[in-house]
Curated annotation (Swiss-Prot):
Its EC number is 1.8.3.4. The gene is selenbp1-a. Pathway: Organosulfur degradation. GO terms for cellular component: cytosol; membrane; nucleus. It comes from Xenopus laevis. GO terms for molecular function: methanethiol oxidase activity; selenium binding. It catalyses: methanethiol + O2 + H2O = hydrogen sulfide + formaldehyde + H2O2 + H(+). Catalyzes the oxidation of methanethiol, an organosulfur compound known to be produced in substantial amounts by gut bacteria. Selenium-binding protein which may be involved in the sensing of reactive xenobiotics in the cytoplasm. May be involved in intra-Golgi protein transport. It is a peripheral membrane protein. This is Methanethiol oxidase. It is found in: Nucleus; Cytoplasm, Cytosol; Membrane. GO terms for biological process: protein transport. Belongs to the selenium-binding protein family.
């Protein structure tokens, strides 16, 4: 989205982005894999303009040409990292498929309200050219290429490498990393060129998580617990930071948006902790735990203690607030991170989860709550599942949230979600003193989709957002 005759996509700076227009539509993948409905996953377009007659409704569905892909995350062909290049246009959404290893390129430029398939990258191209599989996070690079992280090799073993796509033809160019430099596991990544660094995170071996979560797989070393530090210029793995038992399964990673910043935050799902990572005086990188969500002692659940399971985090464009979701406990939290070493909890809201009152789980010991939260009802619907993917408006005043994590894990931890479908909700944010409040007028009920209940995951704005765009 150009702002002048001589500039490229996105915004000049994160603070400029905060002044961008209010979101009117969003894109999000909807997943049928594991639900028992043999239909393709699809990209949904949702109207989020309160002035529109189709507000909080799905206005378009783009089915993929195959079944059982497991659409998951998405990225752009170009973004604010190419702001200085007026020849670049943000008009293609990149959709890596977590299980099939396909990569779909979707044209959202010709008609933003009715996207269409532009190209399909078949799995064998990723397998043969890169030796990788299970693509996850897609980021556009300042050079015009597209970089996609991988979780494994074609045999289902863990392998943290990166696929490069040509930004014009969308052909697989090969690996970003130097040959032999892959990490043990992969997941998310964020780059900060002014410090010549990229840091990637670790979920686990696809052959482990693909069949459901087992604590024995964690104990057997099939899940990650490290941050991998890469030399951005030389494409080499130069350091691995072991987060230990307090940093099991580090997923979403965010540098501060200021391109000069030498620090950021990462959410560790299983340990339910937030680590701050930072550059030391000698140029090495280090990490320290700054937030810990206590587990709850429970009965009526597969394990005696229930972690929060931090599955998504994001940072506001002014680098003032951190938000994250506890998928199992059922809450979203807002922290003031003016002092990144000492985050301050300023907002919290419960939206379903596994510990709500009246459910099968009884909390025996809770270090935070005096009683179990009540179920949440929006427009007459009791919200199933727990809050998972979150997206913040450019101005920081609205959060959109969906409830699906990954179809097999949804089936394991929230089986009713497959019967009722996911939901998309909207939260109003107090950006002055902190605070989160549910918007009672917004509900997208994916249980009422034409082909049956569906799972909905990551949310994207057409003009970019605080998790898609990186400033260099």
């Amino acid at each position: 989205m150009a702002k002048c005759g001589s500039c490229g996509p996105g915004y000049k700076s994160p603070l400029d982005a905060m002044k961008g227009p209010r979101e009117e539509i969003v894109y999000l993948p909807c997943i049928y894999r594991s639900t028992g409905i043999n239909k393709p996953d699809y990209l949904a377009t949702v109207d989020v303009d309160p002035k529109s007659p189709s507000y909080s409704q799905v206005i378009h569905r783009l089915p993929m040409p195959n079944v059982n892909d497991e659409l998951h995350h998405s990225g752009w062909n170009t973004c604010s990292s190419c702001y200085g290049d007026s020849s670049k246009v943000r008009n293609k959404l990149i959709l890596p498929c977590l299980i099939s290893s396909r990569i779909y390129v979707v044209d959202v430029g010709s008609d933003p309200r009715a996207p269409r398939i532009h190209k399909t990258v078949e799995p064998y191209e990723v397998f043969w050219k890169c030796g990788l599989a299970n693509p996850h996070t897609s980021h556009c690079l300042g050079c015009g290429e597209i970089m996609i992280s991988s979780l494994g090799d074609p045999c289902g073993n863990g392998k943290g490498g990166f696929v490069l796509l040509d930004g014009e033809t969308f052909e697989v160019k090969g690996n970003w990393e130097v040959e032999g430099e892959s990490a043990q596991f992969g997941y998310d990544f964020w780059y900060q060129p002014r410090h010549n660094v990229m840091i990637s995170t670790e979920w686990g071996a696809p052959k482990a998580f693909a069949l459901g979560f087992k604590m024995e797989d964690v104990q057997a070393g099939h899940y990650g617990h490290s941050l991998n530090v890469w030399d951005w210029t030389e494409h080499r793995l130069v350091q691995t930071i072991d987060l230990g038992k307090d940093g099991l399964i580090p997923l979403e990673i965010r540098f501060l948006h200021n391109p000069d910043a030498d620090q950021g935050l990462v959410g560790c799902a299983l340990s339910s902790s937030i680590f701050r990572f930072y550059k030391e005086k000698d140029g090495k990188w280090a990490a320290e735990k700054v937030i810990q969500v206590p587990s709850k002692k429970v009965e009526g659940w597969p394990m005696p203690e229930m972690p929060g399971l931090i599955t998504d985090i994001l940072i506001s464009l002014d680098d003032r607030f951190l938000y994250f979701s506890n998928w199992l406990h059922g809450d979203i939290r807002q922290y003031d991170i003016t002092d990144t070493r000492n985050p301050k909890l300023v907002g919290q809201i419960f939206l379903g989860g596994s510990i709500q009152r009246g459910g099968p789980v009884t909390v025996l010991e809770d270090k935070e709550l005096e009683c179990q939260p009540d179920p949440v009802t929006v427009k007459g619907k009791i919200i199933p599942g727990g809050p998972q993917m979150i997206q913040l408006s450019l101005d920081g005043k609205r959060i959109y949230v969906t409830s699906s994590l990954y179809s097999i894990w949804d089936k394991q931890f929230y089986p009713d979600l497959l019967k009722e479908g996911a939901v998309m909700l909207q939260i109003d944010v107090d950006t002055k003193k902190g605070g989160l409040k549910l918007n009672p007028n917004f509900l997208v009920d994916f249980g009422k989709e034409p082909d049956g209940p569906v799972l909905a995951h990551e949310i994207r704005y057409p003009g970019g957002d605080c998790t898609s765009d990186i400033w260099i």
